[in-house]
């Protein structure tokens, strides 16, 4: 036929058997990629430190998705939450990966079978003997089956009735684990951070899908609607399917970037807004304040801050700090976190406590400015020493650490004070190993950033694809150059697959 590359998919027009074949092959490729990627990630993943070197710091992409659905153990004897296990069972990370690869192989064979045996009786219209598909009926079948799967996931898997439950954590990502979830039927179910909404919405949407599927199986569309929406044309199916996919892609890009119960920070890393709003910093100060109210010393109060919470309050874990073309995991950027040095508290020679102004998300460099409790600038690291009034040396700034590895250690040497003031711009101070992975010191994004960018980009492309194919199917006769005043009744499109010039026509 000599088709140009952008028209090759016309070979499956008017050929239901091979249309099924290429879709099964597509499923084989997707499942095969997922299983292979899981095995690759398991080969390079280091589960030894779930606090300072979690999956999202290591750039894992498919492991978080398995984990949020209830997989936590490996045949290698480790658990994602730390510690060892002896009986991981079939549904370990490797078990899921293997199931995808086996499924991919079966789909590959099924695709070949359907390509060879394309001319099946089931695809033929018994009245004409020609291949045809009852698309409204197929829509009803698909709606019913997807509704069934949706209902089953919400009612059984998520609730733990027959399944493991899902990953649930506290608002600060400290206590996450897989557990069963009760459906939230009240207004709280609409809060995107309430896990119960996942169960209730799947049950509700699944029920609606089942009922809508049964409706479309039992009720035929009116003739005018059938013709108006071109329900007999497979390109209508393509257009509406693309619409469903791009809509879903936009939704998940939002839930990933802004955060929700479906994207826990323990699995995908914190969101940029948690840095922008000082979310973890406020919780840390609240806990320290509560400790001081119980007559604990500053050192005791800061020592009780979980290292995990302190690590979230570090700009290197902000997904918006990674550049668009900086490939690799976060560990390849600023290094592997080894330990929390503690919280630095700066004071001037008059004893005032000073706070380092933190770097906003979209800055690569930022002036080092120390302010007092009223927000008045008291010290800085000047650009021009000749005109400085507030330099660390002039103001006599000292620093003392509370909690962490340097607990109780203080420094008055200006060079050391300035070093820690610069590092305090980036949040809590951590010791980072940049030698092991030859990390270059340039921040990388987390899987949260990559997922969002990928899905938002493809959603935009698919949006244009929906418009393109929708317009093609609605205005096919116009695009084909058929004169609306034509006095011959043309059976258009029967042979568009092969471009057959012998289209039947009948003068009226």
From Swiss-Prot:
<dbReference type="InterPro" id="IPR000932">
    <property type="entry name" value="PS_antenna-like"/>
</dbReference>
<dbReference type="GO" id="GO:0009523">
    <property type="term" value="C:photosystem II"/>
</dbReference>
<feature type="transmembrane region" description="Helical">
    <location>
        <begin position="101"/>
        <end position="115"/>
    </location>
</feature>
<keyword id="KW-0604">Photosystem II</keyword>
<keyword id="KW-0934">Plastid</keyword>
<feature type="transmembrane region" description="Helical">
    <location>
        <begin position="140"/>
        <end position="156"/>
    </location>
</feature>
<keyword id="KW-0148">Chlorophyll</keyword>
<keyword id="KW-0150">Chloroplast</keyword>
<comment type="subunit">
    <text>PSII is composed of 1 copy each of membrane proteins PsbA, PsbB, PsbC, PsbD, PsbE, PsbF, PsbH, PsbI, PsbJ, PsbK, PsbL, PsbM, PsbT, PsbX, PsbY, PsbZ, Psb30/Ycf12, at least 3 peripheral proteins of the oxygen-evolving complex and a large number of cofactors. It forms dimeric complexes.</text>
</comment>
<feature type="transmembrane region" description="Helical">
    <location>
        <begin position="21"/>
        <end position="36"/>
    </location>
</feature>
<comment type="similarity">
    <text>Belongs to the PsbB/PsbC family. PsbB subfamily.</text>
</comment>
<keyword id="KW-0812">Transmembrane</keyword>
<feature type="transmembrane region" description="Helical">
    <location>
        <begin position="237"/>
        <end position="252"/>
    </location>
</feature>
<keyword id="KW-0157">Chromophore</keyword>
<keyword id="KW-1133">Transmembrane helix</keyword>
<dbReference type="InterPro" id="IPR036001">
    <property type="entry name" value="PS_II_antenna-like_sf"/>
</dbReference>
<keyword id="KW-0472">Membrane</keyword>
<dbReference type="Pfam" id="PF00421">
    <property type="entry name" value="PSII"/>
</dbReference>
<comment type="function">
    <text>One of the components of the core complex of photosystem II (PSII). It binds chlorophyll and helps catalyze the primary light-induced photochemical processes of PSII. PSII is a light-driven water:plastoquinone oxidoreductase, using light energy to abstract electrons from H(2)O, generating O(2) and a proton gradient subsequently used for ATP formation.</text>
</comment>
<feature type="transmembrane region" description="Helical">
    <location>
        <begin position="457"/>
        <end position="472"/>
    </location>
</feature>
<dbReference type="GO" id="GO:0045156">
    <property type="term" value="F:electron transporter, transferring electrons within the cyclic electron transport pathway of photosynthesis activity"/>
</dbReference>
<keyword id="KW-0793">Thylakoid</keyword>
<feature type="transmembrane region" description="Helical">
    <location>
        <begin position="203"/>
        <end position="218"/>
    </location>
</feature>
<dbReference type="InterPro" id="IPR017486">
    <property type="entry name" value="PSII_PsbB"/>
</dbReference>
<keyword id="KW-0602">Photosynthesis</keyword>
<dbReference type="GO" id="GO:0016168">
    <property type="term" value="F:chlorophyll binding"/>
</dbReference>
<dbReference type="GO" id="GO:0009772">
    <property type="term" value="P:photosynthetic electron transport in photosystem II"/>
</dbReference>
<protein>
    <recommendedName>
        <fullName>Photosystem II CP47 reaction center protein</fullName>
    </recommendedName>
</protein>
<dbReference type="GO" id="GO:0009535">
    <property type="term" value="C:chloroplast thylakoid membrane"/>
</dbReference>
């Amino acid at each position: 036929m000599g088709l140009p590359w952008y028209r090759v998919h016309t070979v499956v027009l008017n050929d239901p058997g091979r249309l099924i074949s290429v879709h099964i092959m597509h499923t084989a490729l997707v499942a095969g990629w997922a299983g292979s990627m899981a095995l690759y990630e398991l080969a390079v993943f280091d589960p030894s430190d779930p606090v300072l070197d979690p999956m999202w710091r290591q750039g894992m992409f498919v492991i978080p998705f398995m984990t949020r659905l209830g997989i936590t153990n490996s045949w290698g004897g480790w658990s994602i939450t730390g510690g060892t296990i002896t009986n991981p069972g079939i549904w370990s990370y490797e078990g899921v990966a293997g199931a995808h690869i086996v499924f991919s192989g079966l789909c590959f064979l099924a695709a070949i079978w359907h390509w060879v045996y394309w001319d099946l009786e089931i695809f033929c219209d018994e009245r004409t003997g020609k291949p045809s598909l009852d698309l409204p009926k197929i829509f009803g079948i698909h709606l019913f089956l997807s509704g069934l799967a949706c209902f089953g996931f919400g009612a059984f898997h998520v609730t733990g009735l027959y399944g493991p439950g899902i990953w649930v954590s506290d608002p600060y990502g400290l206590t996450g684990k897989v557990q069963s979830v009760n459906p939230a039927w009240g207004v709280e179910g609409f809060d995107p951070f309430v896990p119960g909404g996942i169960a209730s919405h799947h049950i509700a949407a699944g029920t609606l899908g089942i009922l809508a599927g049964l409706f479309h199986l039992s009720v035929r569309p009116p003739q005018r609607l059938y013709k108006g929406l071109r329900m007999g044309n497979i390109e209508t199916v393509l257009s509406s399917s693309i619409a469903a996919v791009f809509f879903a892609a936009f939704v998940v890009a939002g839930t990933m970037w802004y955060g929700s119960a479906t994207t826990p920070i323990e699995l995908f890393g914190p969101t940029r807004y948690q840095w922008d709003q000082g979310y973890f910093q406020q919780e840390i100060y609240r806990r320290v304040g509560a400790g001081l109210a119980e007559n604990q010393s500053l050192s005791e109060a800061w020592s009780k801050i979980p290292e995990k919470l302190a690590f979230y309050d570090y700009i290197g874990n902000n997904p918006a700090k990674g550049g668009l073309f900086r490939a690799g995991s976060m560990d390849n950027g600023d290094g592997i976190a080894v330990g929390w040095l503690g919280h630095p508290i700066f004071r001037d020679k008059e004893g005032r406590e000073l706070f380092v102004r933190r770097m906003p998300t979209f800055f690569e460099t930022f002036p080092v400015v120390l302010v007092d409790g009223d927000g008045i600038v008291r010290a800085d690291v000047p650009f021009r020493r000749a005109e400085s009034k507030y330099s660390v040396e002039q103001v006599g700034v000292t620093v003392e650490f509370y909690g962490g590895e340097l607990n109780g250690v203080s420094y008055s040497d200006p060079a050391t004070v300035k070093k820690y003031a610069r590092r305090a711009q980036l949040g809590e101070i951590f010791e980072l190993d940049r030698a092991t992975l030859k990390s270059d010191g340039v921040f990388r994004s987390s899987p949260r950033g990559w997922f969002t960018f990928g899905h938002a980009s493809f959603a935009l492309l698919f949006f244009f694809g929906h418009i393109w194919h929708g317009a093609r199917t609605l205005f096919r006769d116009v695009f084909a150059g058929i004169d609306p005043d034509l006095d011959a009744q043309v059976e258009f499109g029967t042979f568009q697959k092969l471009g057959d010039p012998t289209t039947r026509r009948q003068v009226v």
